[in-house]
Amino acid sequence: MPQTLHVHSRVKDYDILFTDHVLKTLADCLGERKQRKLLFITDQTVYHLYQTLFEEFAQQYNAFVHVCPPGGQTKSLERVSAIYDQLIAENFSKKDMIVTIGGGVVGDLGGFVAATYSRGIPYIQIPTTLLSQVDSSIGGKVGVHFKSLTNMIGSIYPPEAIIISTTFLETLPQREFSCGISEMLKIGFIHDRPLFQQLRDFQKETDKQGLERLIYQSISNKKQIVEQDEFENGLRMSLNFGHTLGHAIESLCHHDFYHHGEAIAIGMVVDAKLAVSKGLLPKEDLDSLLQVFERYQLPTTLERADVSATSLFDVFKTDKKNSEQHIIFILPTETGFTTLAINKDDHQFVEKLDSLL
């Protein structure tokens, strides 16, 4: 599906390149930088699945590889430090480049390293999971976890380019595919109900071209939102639908039990229930959300982990989206979204939350 989307950024513009030929597209992106040093950051899963691809990289470029353990706990300052050590040992300068090839964890981690090493070096993202292709690679957000706090340290640092190839999705486990669908449903439910309906009816096994169209549509939606509100002062906040609770679940579960898209699905259900209770969203819309989550085997309750409403509320207080005295939730409405500000001392809300979990 060779196409290109151009993203306008206040930091720097970049292209999202859709391709079936990753090596050629990467070579085109690098241009004169082909002669510079490249550090490929990936994880063990991707490295073993695509070892031939990495061997071709090594033949064509002055390339080094940093292979991370898989999983969310890799997004740590300890891993950042290990990558810094490798960059310094190989004498990387601001003229050299990082290429991330992996899911959202690798993209966020590698982007953060690029943003901070030598006060910023260029990088290219090659996302290999559905979630990273439609969500985490788009918009320039990079960062790592701090202790148990999700994405607490980070920046907005756009890449030189993002290379999207659905070929990578052929090796993606169903659970990870559903996590990507979760983020696509999020943007569809808030901003593009026709997209939501198409995802509800989509048949993965028989419609590869349909998947490519849905990916392109999801990315186009996020591109438009990011271009209007890159630094999350208004419209881009809508993309945090499900994320206040979702990030708290990830933090308390130490990024085990629930993958990101699963935690966000639970968060979306609770946000939608809150919206229904306040008369902002028809119950039929909540029912539709629950049905499509069930279809994609996404969780809608916290049955896998012993997590209390009180412990979740305590984590909410550290959320980076908060204002000084309030915890911020994004609630879906019949026509879009609104924000709900909960006082950090509102212990009655804990009881309300407990009834919704």
From Swiss-Prot:
Pathway: Metabolic intermediate biosynthesis; chorismate biosynthesis; chorismate from D-erythrose 4-phosphate and phosphoenolpyruvate: step 2/7. One of its GO terms (molecular function) is metal ion binding. It holds the Pfam family DHQ_synthase. SUPFAM superfamilies: Dehydroquinate synthase-like (SSF56796). Its cofactor is Co(2+); Zn(2+); NAD(+). Zn(2+) binds at E183, H243, H260. One of its GO terms (biological process) is chorismate biosynthetic process. NAD(+) binds at G104, V105, V106, G107, D108, T128, T129, K141, F168, L169, E170, T171. It is found in: Cytoplasm. It catalyses: 7-phospho-2-dehydro-3-deoxy-D-arabino-heptonate = 3-dehydroquinate + phosphate. Gene3D superfamilies: 3.40.50.1970, Dehydroquinate synthase-like - alpha domain. It is an enzyme of class 4 (lyase). CDD domains: DHQS (cd08195). Keywords: Amino-acid biosynthesis, Aromatic amino acid biosynthesis, Cobalt, Cytoplasm, Lyase, Metal-binding, NAD, Nucleotide-binding, Zinc. Its EC number is 4.2.3.4. GO terms for cellular component: cytoplasm. Binds 1 divalent metal cation per subunit. Can use either Co(2+) or Zn(2+). Belongs to the sugar phosphate cyclases superfamily. Dehydroquinate synthase family. Catalyzes the conversion of 3-deoxy-D-arabino-heptulosonate 7-phosphate (DAHP) to dehydroquinate (DHQ). This is 3-dehydroquinate synthase. The gene is aroB.
